[in-house]
From Swiss-Prot:
The EC number(s) this enzyme carries: 7.4.2.8
Taxonomic source organism: Escherichia coli O6:H1 (strain CFT073 / ATCC 700928 / UPEC)
Protein name as annotated: Protein translocase subunit SecA
SMART domains found in the cross-reference section: SecA_DEAD (SM00957), SecA_PP_bind (SM00958)
Residue span of region Disordered: 859-901
Family matches, as PROSITE patterns: SECA, SECA_MOTOR_DEAD
Lineage, highest ranks first: Bacteria, Pseudomonadati, Pseudomonadota, Gammaproteobacteria, Enterobacterales
SUPFAM superfamilies in the cross-refs: Helical scaffold and wing domains of SecA (SSF81886), P-loop containing nucleoside triphosphate hydrolases (SSF52540), Pre-protein crosslinking domain of SecA (SSF81767)
């Protein structure tokens, strides 16, 4: 009550922010006449003037009024579009490390040009982040004329581009690309083997479009670069045959409930649990199939990988549905993004789940992958010096943006008042009744010429509605992950009178639905349109536009509520843009996932009390409130999951930053010999300590063990026992110094053979390769630790603290292993004089020719077995083109002495 009273007196924080910014908008507006007087050249010259002022030490914020006025004037000249005052407000919000909530149709793309231009003046680069490649390309090409008019360069960062093209895109003042591609480039840069391979600059300013989709919906999805692990596709196929024998039961066994099934599914946490009966049956079936021996337990340590296969297969069958979670196209399982309904080509589920789904669908099973590098979007975007974002729906997630990303949310007012009618939800008992009611609503709306957009939450549901519309004889377009190539074209014409469009979730986001359809799309379809044709198209469009407005504008139908209110608001936001008329309504049934899992008992009880008849709907504020509460519950739960994920990932993130920082330093220096000498001392000290404990009696020394270790791990054959026999006065410290001196001497002799430059290059290569290999193993170990750490809670220990403690000790152990592996590899490398390598190469060639002739003869004799044996023999002797060169340079054979071939 007190807070409400204070807000009334002083205004909310949002109001105060906007009041402050409106003063700057007035200054920008006052500059407009002055800007209009400037010639094109003078206007372009402003960019160089601003940069010069920044170099002299002026603060970027001081340039806002003039810079924004310049962009507005340039936009008028290039596009014939003038930034509204609310767009200037949005631009200021985005410059202040905030999230701007701007309704659909308010011109977010044009708004973004203001902060993008301002921050590009620093010369450090601006990354505009979009949700898909189409939008990145569209926005870059649309805004390129404006930025180039003002003397700035524009780059597009797309998947599959060669490194030089990517480097050029990142070197541009403003770069457009997708969140995935920026993240993957960051990971790839941190796996590079030379500074020239890196493409990104220092991360300066990110301007994220559809920020809620990227920073919240995809926050739980880590970006992973992986390499192939061992092939186990046969096992997935064998386990897959067993799963159909199992029966699902509704809930888990407990003291009060004993089911008849073999497994239960927890839809909330998306987990599958075997019952006692299920475990017994699985073990019997595994024995029967010859996968497991009689009397063995599935939970024994020896069968841990088998348990992994069973769990993956169970999840694939019970939790993942074709045309909802994935589609099968050209013999490949392609994931469908649950938030956007788009297919995610090239993305794969981890933990063997993707292989299990491939086995279930009977397509070719691809190898499992091993993580080489990974990062979550939460941690990637926090690497930028300055982060901002815009979306039509952020206010419901303002707390999360603030607590995780330290970004405030500012709701920017609309240019014209919103007049859309949001009708109350209608709840039916069954799915069939609900679909029937939707069809009737569509018939009514289209009869009076009103366009309708039907939003569904999966491909399966969109096809179900489509089939019913076809049966009813209603012409319509379907927009889902299966056909998203023509997405923008369908969305652009969804405002046509009486048009019916079915869209999965937020497919087509970023393209405005214009009432009456898009006249620009019609003009673009003509080869060489004349001025008369364009005028006629515009006139026809105006008639259609007015007709649609008179019919009530675009009508939105939601076929069920999403887990998040924000996604529902996004669907509603497609209607009522720029003060247009419009309406929306959600149709629900008690069989919908959200109602079934979170709101069923209360609402179905209410419906029973009201004595509902088939086909009847309940429409009451109580029901709408109960559903909103259910959504809040899910949102809160998902927020907790994301927050917890971040807390755990923060531990890995600190380690990742340390490793990548060291790796980049290593890449940028050409001579690492000082580092090598330093770690050699540490490694030899630790090795000797293990056999000659410091300040111990000679009787406690294990000299044979030390000699063997030095020989095996460092290729050092030292007569230590002989030294001690001949020199009784040789004490511990002197002995340590002598062993280290001998190792340095042997190493220096190798360096003399190959030359200092070659040795420096080789040292750097070994350090980078060893670091990458150990980091990869460390990531896998961290993943295993993370999966089981919650069990520490049963021992009254805080899992998070335990994870921090253990992961730190694992990290320290990894760094020690790094030192040891590097020195061991460098010590064991065999070097030869160039003449020796040439001689060996000559011998190898002669031997290869001789064997090839023999092989030819054996082929003529059709003795394939002998040929195979010879081929194997040849393979043993030959140095592979990608193998390390025998000279010990550290280069690949094909880039060193292999060039002689």
């Amino acid at each position: 009550m007190l807070i409400k009273l204070l807000t009334k007196v002083f205004g909310s924080r949002n109001d105060r922010t906007l009041r402050r910014m409106r003063k700057v908008v007035n200054i920008i507006n006052a500059m407009e006449p002055e800007m209009e007087k400037l010639s094109d050249e003078e206007l372009k010259g402003k960019t160089a003037e601003f940069r010069a002022r920044l170099e002299k030490g002026e603060v970027l914020e001081n340039l806002i009024p003039e810079a924004f006025a310049v962009v507005r004037e340039a936009s008028k000249r290039v596009f014939g579009m003038r930034h509204f005052d609310v767009q200037l407000l949005g631009g200021m919000v985005l410059n202040e490390r905030c999230i701007a909530e701007m309704r659909t149709g308010e011109g977010k793309t044009l708004t973004a040009t203001l902060p993008a231009y301002l921050n590009a003046l620093t010369g450090k680069g601006v990354h505009v982040v979009t949700v898909n490649d189409y939008l990145a390309q569209r926005d870059a090409e649309n805004n390129r004329p404006l930025f180039e008019f003002l003397g700035l360069t524009v780059g597009i960062n797309l998947p599959g581009m060669p490194a030089p093209a990517k480097r050029e895109a990142y070197a541009a003042d403003i770069t457009y690309g997708t969140n995935n591609e920026y993240g993957f480039d960051y990971l790839r840069d941190n796996m590079a083997f030379s500074p020239e391979e890196r493409v990104q600059r220092k991360l300066h300013y990110a301007l994220v479009d559809e920020v809620d989709s990227i920073l919240i919906d995809e926050a739980r999805t880590p970006l992973i670069i992986s390499g192939p692990a061992e092939d186990s596709s046969e096992m997935y196929k064998r386990v897959n045959k067993i799963i159909p024998h199992l029966i699902r039961q509704e809930k888990e066994d407990s003291e009060t409930f004993q089911g008849e099934g073999h497994f239960s599914v927890d839809e909330k946490s998306r987990q599958v649990n075997l019952t006692e009966r299920g475990l017994v049956l699985i073990e019997e079936l595994l024995v029967k199939e010859g996968i497991m021996d009689e009397g063995e337990s599935l939970y024994s340590p020896a069968n841990i990988m088998l348990m992994h296969h069973v769990t993956a297969a169970l999840r694939a069958h019970a939790l993942f549905t074709r045309d909802v979670d994935y589609i099968v196209k050209d013999g490949e399982v392609i994931i469908v993004d649950e938030h956007t309904g788009r297919t995610m080509q090239g993305r794969r589920w981890s933990d063997g789940l993707h292989q299990a789904v491939e086995a279930k669908e009977g397509v070719q099973i691809q190898n499992e992958n091993q993580t080489l590098a990974s990062i979550t979007f939460q941690n990637y975007f926090r690497l930028y010096e300055k982060l901002a974002g815009m979306t039509g729906t952020a206010d419901t997630e303002a707390f999360e943006f603030s607590s995780i990303y330290k970004l405030d949310t500012v709701v920017v007012p609309t240019n014209r008042p919103m007049i859309r009618k949001d009708l109350p939800d209608l709840v039916y008992m069954t799915e069939a009744e609900k679909i029937q009611a939707i069809i009737e609503d569509i018939k009514e709306r289209t009869a009076k010429g009103q366009p309708v957009l039907v939003g569904t939450i999966s491909i399966e549901k969109s096809e179900l509605v489509s089939n019913e519309l076809t049966k009813a004889g209603i012409k319509h377009n379907v927009l889902n992950a299966k056909f998203h190539a023509n997405e923008a074209a369908i969305v652009a014409q969804a405002g046509y009178p009486a048009a019916v469009t079915i869209a999965t979730n937020m497919a087509g986001r970023g393209t405005d639905i214009v009432l009456g359809g898009s006249w620009q799309a019609e003009v673009a379809a003509l080869e060489n349109p004349t001025a008369e044709q364009i005028e006629k198209i515009k006139a026809d469009w105006q008639v259609r536009h007015d007709a649609v407005l008179a019919a009530g504008g675009l009508h939105i139908i939601g076929t069920e509520r999403h887990e998040s209110r924000r996604i529902d608001n996004q669907l509603r936001g497609r209607s009522g843009r720029q003060g247009d008329a419009g309406s929306s309504r959600f149709y629900l049934s008690m069989e919908d996932a959200l109602m079934r899992i979170f709101a069923s008992d209360r609402v179905s009880g209410m419906m029973r009390k009201l004595g509902m008849k088939p086909g009847e709907a309940i429409e009451h504020p109580w029901v709408t409130k109960a559903i909103a509460n259910a959504q809040r519950k899910v949102e809160s739960r998902n927020f907790d999951i994301r927050k917890q994920l971040l807390e755990y990932d923060d531990v890995a993130n600190d380690q990742r930053r340390a490793i990548y920082s060291q790796r980049n330093e290593l890449l940028d220096v050409s001579d690492v010999s000082e580092t090598i000498n330093s770690i050699r001392e540490d490694v030899f000290k630790a090795t000797i300590d293990a056999y000659i404990p410091p300040q111990s009696l000679e009787e406690m020394w294990d000299i044979p063990g030390l000699q063997e270790r030095l020989k095996n791990d460092f290729d050092l054959d030292l007569p230590i026992a002989e030294w001690l026999d001949k020199e009784p006065e040789l004490h511990e410290e002197t002995l340590r110094e002598r062993i280290l001196a001998q190792s340095i001497e042997v190493y220096q002799r190798k360096e003399e053979v190959v030359g200092a430059e070659m040795m420096r290059h080789f040292e750097k290569g070994v350090m980078l390769q060893t670091l990458d290999s150990l980091w990869k193993e460390h990531l896998a170990a961290m993943d295993y630790l993370r999966q089981g750490i919650h069990l520490r809670g049963y021992a009254q220990k805080d899992p998070k603290q335990e994870y921090k403690r253990e992961s730190f000790s694992m990290f320290a152990a990894m760094l020690e292993s790094l030192k040891y592996e590097v020195i061991s590899t460098l010590s064991k490398v065999q070097v030869r004089m160039p003449e020796e390598v040439e001689e060996l190469e000559q011998q190898r060639r002669m031997e290869a020719e001789r064997l090839a002739q023999m092989q030819q003869l054996s082929h003529q004799d059709d003795d394939s077995a002998a040929a195979a044996a010879l081929a194997a023999q040849t393979g043993e002797r030959k140095v592979g083109r990608n193998d390390p060169c025998p000279c010990g340079s550290g280069k690949k054979y094909k880039q060193c002495h292999g060039r002689l071939q």
